[in-house]
Structure formats: C-alpha cells, structure tokens
C-alpha cells in the first residue's frame, strides 16, 4: 500500500474517533466542551487532508490507470481491501470507486479472469450499500439492489465457460458470485429461496467438483446452506410455498446440527443465530405455536450478555429482539402480556450500546440497529420510540444530534418572531388550531418546532457511515443515496404514536417551496397541513448545514452571513418568501444566529450529562 493510501485510512479512523461520543471523565462541562470543539477542528483538518490525498494521490492514478504497472495495481487492490473488510467498513463508497475503475481496466484489456474478480468485489461493495436500506420500501431500494445483483449475475454467467477457465481462483469467484445473487431484499421470499436452491444444486454437482478439486467445496455448500437458513420470511402476509419450506428445513437442520457438534466440542451452547433459525422453522412447519416460538426466543435473549461484544451475542441481543417485536407488531393481541418483557429488552439493549467499544465502522451493529428501529414497539409505559432514536443519535451520531438540536432551537426562535406578528400563522396544523389560549398556543408551536428539529434528520441513522466516517466529498451515488434519509425518517416516525406528528418535517425539509427541485418526490407541499413548520425546518436546516463540517461532503463551508445571503437569493424557489422576507431583517438574522449558538452549547451540555450519568 502506498503512503497516501495508508494515511487516508488512518485519517478516516482518527476522524471517527475524534467525532465519537466522549466520556467527561470527571472534567467540568467547559473542559469537556473545549475538547469536543478542538476534536472537531482537528477532524475538519484531517478531512481536508484526505481530500488532498485523493486529489493528489488517487485521482492521477485512476486517470492514468491504463499506464499503471502491476505493483501500482496491486497497491490499489490492497488499498481497497483496507476500505471494506467483511462487516468492518472504513469507506465503502471509495471501495466501490476503486473496483469500478479496476473493472473498466479489465474490460478494456479483455482480461476475463480479472474482470470476474472485480465484478465480485464490486458486488460486495454494492451489497454493503444495500444493507443500509433496511426498513425502506422495496421500490426505494430496488435501484441499488439491482446494481449489486447485476455484478454477481454477470460474474456468475461465466459458469458457462467453466471448462475453458483454468484458474482455480477465478472459478471460485464465479461460484461465489452465483451464491451471492441471492443477497439483498426480494419482493417475495420464494425468489431468494429458488435462487439459493439452484446454487446448491450447482455446488453439489460432482462434475464441477471433479474439474476443480482445489476449491473448498464443503465450505461453499455450508455457507450456501447458511444463506438459505437466513431466508425465513417472518411475516404472516408472505406465505412460503411448501417446497420452499422443505428447502429451508433441510438447510436449517444442516446448519444447526453442525453448530451443535462444533459447540459440543468446546462445551458451549449453539450460536444464537442457528438456534433462532431452528426455532423459527419449527414454527413455520407447524411443529410449534407462536407462543412456543416467542418463549424460545425469550430464552435465547435472556442468555445474552451485555458485556459480550462478539458477533453472535450482538445478534442475539439486538437482532433477535427485532424479530420478536416484529411478531408483536403483527399479532398485537400478544403485546399486553409481553409488555414488561419488551420494556426490559429495550433497557438491556441500551445498556449494551452504552458499553459498546469502538462502534464506528461496525456495519453488523448498525444493520441490527436498523432492524430494531424498524420493528420498535411502543408499550405506553416504557421508553418511547422518539426517546430511543435520540439515544441512538447521542451514542453513535453526536454531530447529527447537535445539528438537529440547533435546528430545533433556531426554528423556535423563528416561530416566536412569526407568532408575534401573525398569531394564527400555524393554524393549518390541527393540534395547533385546537389550542385557543394565546400563551398555550405559543407554547404548543414552540414545542412542536423543537421536536420537528430534533427528529428531522433521524433518517440519517440508516446511512450513518456517510455522516460519521466519510472524510471527503461524497460521490454522486452517495449523494443520491443520502436523499433517502427523508423517506426513511418519514417511514419510521409516521408508524409510531410518539413521533407521528414530526414525520412530515423529516419528509419534506429538503423539498423546494415552488416544487421545481428538491427531494423526495413523494412530499407535496400544498397537500401537507404542516407545511408552514416544514418550511421553517427546511430553512434553518439549510442555514446550519452549509456552515458546518458536514458541508465538506458537498463543497466548501460558508459563513453564516453567506448562508443568509444564499437563502435570500433562493426566495420563492427553495424557500417561502414569507420566511426570507423576515430573514432580510438584520434583527431576525441575528436572533437566529444567537439561537444556533445557544442551541449548540445546550446540545453539547446534553451530551455531557448523558455521558456523565452513564
């Protein structure tokens, strides 16, 4: 690996550490704040340095890739392997860019073996992106799933030329690609099961095995059985066909029996994942009742340890509860008797997350948390969904929490100014119009503004690595993917009573006032009763975002005065003229600036309190 590549990876890891939540360690708030701000200044410097490294080191290499010698190409591949290794993500987007460039080179050189290898690795990188789509509708995620699957499908198509290809490694990539076609989300579980079944037939074909005895066939077959075992559809609306259940049963039992043997040798219990799959398939085959399955899941979850950060314990402590709550969502009549247990589950998970060491880049952890967030069940007495989301932001994305808090405070200041001039400005919003007393109405508006600010960016939790680890300007594909945070936020907030009121703020804060641009297309301003508040969240989000470190993902940071001028220039197009007219007044712009500053300090104090009490 070249020196600039090593420095880039080291900087990404250091930036993640600098911006992660910190323990006060007995220091005063002022000392704590001073360190946080110093860390963010250092992180900004390292981000600028990384962009310089890519500009001066990687970009010239990629532009002259056809002239690169074998050593340079090997260095690039080693660099890529350091960007994404298994579930440890340093920079998945750059991983894809490097392998896309290497694939283009292989195509031009007509190097079939190298082309198959690059298709495989590009597919792995794209699958990493697809894993961030948990909870989104299939229509939203399909574009990314399709790109991922195309890579594996093209590589797997060379199975037709298996006899011609003599390289053992290349044959292995073809077979692994064939298995990976079944990765990602499908519209029905039957599609995934059918593809996996076909892969098993190929891997178990003696003719292929005899032609390449050097490949680890047993391992390939076992891993494909694992993939099949993970295809269980835990939904009462998606009924699996009998032949699919039969295939699942075979794979689940094969995996479970092997795990039992391996665990027995080490005097351990079977892994949580295998035990859960075994219990699930027994339920789907009619060998157990739903109550029986829930009881077995409870036994597994009770065995987890909040001090064990192994992949299997993490699965048992976060992912199994996600499926447990999914059953309770689909069968709500079971919730009353499980209420106290669910509340204790969420508390145990939060205790575990507070203790979790060095979570940055742990894609498995964030994948399981996305699952848990999608199936979260509010009991009425335990932690609300809104509180749970705020705790996740504080623990894993403190900068997003600080930004959201600042947007909330500035929105309150803007609302206060508007209410002084037009007390009925927000009366299109049902719960605001219902309040008659002027003081109570103002309090309701300000509380609503604050909560909308706090929750407007929760969809970023789906794409957390983009915000907490990417230390460079985003690639076009990453920017497009980040737009889905509005859809993800709207979906998650709208499905729970405690957050339903704030869903439109998450949905529409990047839309344009005149509808000419912005996103998502599903937000239609004139059809939204909360549009006045969404307008305010949109403009305050803009004013803070382009003046913060996060702006480095798009270009250069602006000063606050420049941000105000830019917002005014977008009057009537991106922003409501009713808001920009007030922003022209120096007193209003200054009041918002002070609110941002106060909000930043208050948000950091909340971080300080949370860490001091944990």
Would you name each region that the model predicts?
Residues 405-416, 481-494, 559-576:
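An active-site-proximal "capping" alpha-helix that borders the catalytic cofactor pocket
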Residues 473-474, 551-562:
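Short, charged, surface-exposed loops that flank catalytic or proteolytic processing sites
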Residues 403, 456, 485, 509-510:
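Histidine-centered active-site/metal-ligand motif
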Residues 166-169, 214, 429-453, 493-539, ...:
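Histidine/acidic-rich helix-loop-helix segments that form or flank divalent-metal centers
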Residues 125-135, 203-208, 228-234, 409-430, ...:
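Short regulatory "switch" loops immediately downstream of catalytic or recognition motifs
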Residues 344, 348-480, 523:
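Acidic/His-rich, divalent-metal-binding segments that scaffold phosphate/diphosphate chemistry
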């Amino acid at each position: 690996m070249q020196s600039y590549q090593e420095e880039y990876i080291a900087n990404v890891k250091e930036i993640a550490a600098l911006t992660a939540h910190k323990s006060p360690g007995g220091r005063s708030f002022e000392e704590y704040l001073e360190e946080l701000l110093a860390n963010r200044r250092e992180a900004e410097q390292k981000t600028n340095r990384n962009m310089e490294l890519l500009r001066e080191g990687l970009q010239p290499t990629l532009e002259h890739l056809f002239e690169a010698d074998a050593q340079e190409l090997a260095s690039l591949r080693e660099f890529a392997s350091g960007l994404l290794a298994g579930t440890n993500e340093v920079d998945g987007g750059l991983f894809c860019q490097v392998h896309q460039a290497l694939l283009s080179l292989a195509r031009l050189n007509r190097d079939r073996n190298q082309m198959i290898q690059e298709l495989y690795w590009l597919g792995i990188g794209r699958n990493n992106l697809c894993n961030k789509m948990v909870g989104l509708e299939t229509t939203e995620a399909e574009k990314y799933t399709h790109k991922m699957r195309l890579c594996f499908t093209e590589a797997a198509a060379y199975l037709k030329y298996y006899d011609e290809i003599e390289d053992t490694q290349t044959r292995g990539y073809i077979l692994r690609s064939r298995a990976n076609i079944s990765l990602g989300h499908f519209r029905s579980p039957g599609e995934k099961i059918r593809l996996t079944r076909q892969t098993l037939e190929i891997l178990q074909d003696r003719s292929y095995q005899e032609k390449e005895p050097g490949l680890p066939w047993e391992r390939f077959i076992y891993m494909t059985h694992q993939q099949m075992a993970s295809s269980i559809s835990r939904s009462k609306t998606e009924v699996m066909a009998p032949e699919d259940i039969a295939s699942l049963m075979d794979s689940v039992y094969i995996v479970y029996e092997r795990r039992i043997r391996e665990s027995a040798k080490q005097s351990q219990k079977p892994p949580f994942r295998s035990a859960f799959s075994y219990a699930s398939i027994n339920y789907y085959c009619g060998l157990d009742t739903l109550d029986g399955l829930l009881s077995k899941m409870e036994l597994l979850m009770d065995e987890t340890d909040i001090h064990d950060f192994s992949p299997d314990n993490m699965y048992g402590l976060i992912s199994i509860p996600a499926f447990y709550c999914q059953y309770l969502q689909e069968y709500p009549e079971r919730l009353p008797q499980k209420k106290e247990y669910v509340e204790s589950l969420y508390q145990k998970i939060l205790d575990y997350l507070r203790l979790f060491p060095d979570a940055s880049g742990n894609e498995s952890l964030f994948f399981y948390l996305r699952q848990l967030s999608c199936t979260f069940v509010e009991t009425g007495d335990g932690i609300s969904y809104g509180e749970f989301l705020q705790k996740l932001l504080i623990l894993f994305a403190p900068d997003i929490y600080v930004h959201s808090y600042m947007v909330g405070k500035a929105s309150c200041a803007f609302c206060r100014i508007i209410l002084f001039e037009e007390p009925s400005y927000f009366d299109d919003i049902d719960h605001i119009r219902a309040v008659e007393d002027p003081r109570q109405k103002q309090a309701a508006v300000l509380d609503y503004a604050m909560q909308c600010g706090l929750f407007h960016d929760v969809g970023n939790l789906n794409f957390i690595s983009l915000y907490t680890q990417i230390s460079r300007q985003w690639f076009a594909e990453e920017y497009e993917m980040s737009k889905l945070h509005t859809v993800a936020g709207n979906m998650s907030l709208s499905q729970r009573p405690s957050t339903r009121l704030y869903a439109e703020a998450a949905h529409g804060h990047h839309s344009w006032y005149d509808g000419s641009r912005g996103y998502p297309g599903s937000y239609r301003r004139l059809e939204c009763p909360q549009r006045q508040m969404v307008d305010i969240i949109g403009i305050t989000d803009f004013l803070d975002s382009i003046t913060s470190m996060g702006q480095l993902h798009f270009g250069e940071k602006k000063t606050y005065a420049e941000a105000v001028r830019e917002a005014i220039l977008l009057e009537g197009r991106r922003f409501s003229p009713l808001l920009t007219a007030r922003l022209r007044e120096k007193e209003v712009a200054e009041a918002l600036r002070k609110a941002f500053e106060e909000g930043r300090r208050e948000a950091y104090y909340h971080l300080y309190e949370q860490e001091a009490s944990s």
